[in-house]
């Protein structure tokens, strides 16, 4: 029986972000904003690096280039430059994480400390989303992500002037 769980505020860190390191095959991440983020005392990019080293697929879609701290962290993990599948699209505003094509988080939280991360309760954003293994929702999220990933919107896009790294 499928489940749908409402996720709010700090539960994003406990219920969603903690699942990334446990994927068996792949993780697809879509976010408007991405910043240096930690899981416990470990950089999130270190977690992604470990996944790639163990042969997992990691895809990252985001709307804009991250800041200098993120880029410094990124450079500490050479496997990311080599194996991380990454694309930019300035129209990305969805926030979703697909775990092994079987489970999906869909919600408001960006991949930042104030969004999905572990910023203190007094400083974090108020976020809401769902975590589910409902096939219809997982399939729809995968299709939306993959259509952007394949450049399915690029030909008719009205924001090409803002696209620094076109998908197609």
Task: Give residue spans per PLM region.
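PLD/PLD-like phosphodiesterase catalytic module centered on the HKD motif
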Residues: 1-168
